[in-house]
Amino acid sequence: MRRRKAPVREVLGDPVYGNKVVTKFINKMMFDGKKSVAEKIIYKAFNKIEEKSGEKGIEVFEKALERVRPLVEVRSRRVGGATYQVPVEVRASRQQSLSIRWILEATRKRNERMMVDRLANELMDAASDKGAAFKKKEDVHKMAEANKAFAHYRW
């Protein structure tokens, strides 16, 4: 383990909206350091959302992240030879990173042809409590609910 906690680096806002969460999403989406490609995909997806739903793309994006954000998750805890799935609350920073990760995973698994369409549709689905990313959150919450009996093993 490291001696000191690593400092949390400050992220700059994205060039269009000045939003730090959008920057994190762009960075998480980027492959092989191709940031400009990731930015184009996200901004085109926001435009597509505005065309389809009439709502602002950034608002749908924020609503989707909020809806996919998990409140509890399960962590494995070994007690006397048995491994228990212990439900624990999720820190705010982890909630954000998990919601970003789940939306991107769900987006990449969709079968529309263009990444722009996939992202736009997944964000709209997540904002309206549908889609694979929202289902992932529901599954995590169900696991935590099912293992509520082991909550006293918290650490």
Swiss-Prot record:
The keyword RNA-binding applies. One of its GO terms (molecular function) is tRNA binding. InterPro entries: Ribosomal_uS7 (IPR000235), Ribosomal_uS7_bac/org-type (IPR005717), Ribosomal_uS7_CS (IPR020606), Ribosomal_uS7_dom (IPR023798), Ribosomal_uS7_dom_sf (IPR036823). GO terms for biological process: ribosomal small subunit assembly; translation. Keywords: Ribonucleoprotein, Ribosomal protein, RNA-binding, rRNA-binding, tRNA-binding. The keyword rRNA-binding applies. One of its GO terms (cellular component) is ribosome. HAMAP family: Ribosomal_uS7_B. One of the primary rRNA binding proteins, it binds directly to 16S rRNA where it nucleates assembly of the head domain of the 30S subunit. Is located at the subunit interface close to the decoding center, probably blocks exit of the E-site tRNA. Part of the 30S ribosomal subunit. Contacts proteins S9 and S11. Belongs to the universal ribosomal protein uS7 family. NCBIfam families: rpsG_bact (TIGR01029). This is Small ribosomal subunit protein uS7. It comes from Helicobacter pylori (strain ATCC 700392 / 26695) (Campylobacter pylori). The gene is rpsG.
